[in-house]
Amino acid sequence: FEDDFVWQGDDYRVKREEARTALIAVAEACLGRKLQDDPLIVGTSGRYEFRNKGLDVLLEGMKRLAGLERLDREVVLYVMVPAANRGARADLQKHLQDPSQPIDGSQWPWATHYLENMQWDPIVRAIDGSPLADPASKVHVIFVPSYLDDRDGIFDKSYYELLVGMDLTLFPSYYEPWGYTPLESIAFSVPTVTTTLAGFGLWIDRRE
């Protein structure tokens, strides 16, 4: 990474605050309600390889977490994995610009974009009918099936401009030659969890 890859000082604090504000606003719009103060914002990203990237394990872990009786803090997991979609949800766009605009109740609430072939989507199928779909749950998943390149239509920020607002990232890969995403997370001072089945995780493990 270049020396100026990560914001420093006041610039970092401003970017983090802006990112958290955006992440919370989008989650609340999708869920149709306010979150508790200071939710734990968790993220994962990468190619849409449901098993190889460990998305199956991650979502199963979130289901178990949602089943805990005593969970003091709300958790929002952002799954930022590009997938076939037909653009940003118009109702979310309007609501984010003007909160008096209603959310379309006919839309699948946990995605920011119109998904193609929803009935076959592994993330959709993992959430539907699970504790993660319970409105009373304190654990929420928001699926962002778009490249984050400043023009996704919902955030209109880059991936790094959102990464900086997270409290934790999770990359439970089954296999990864190296894996840049945990390294990027650390670069932005966001704690990360990965596996020793990924090159970066194995390298860290051997240095301990």
Language-model region placement:
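Catalytic cores of carbohydrate-active enzymes across secretory and cytosolic contexts
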Residues: 1-208
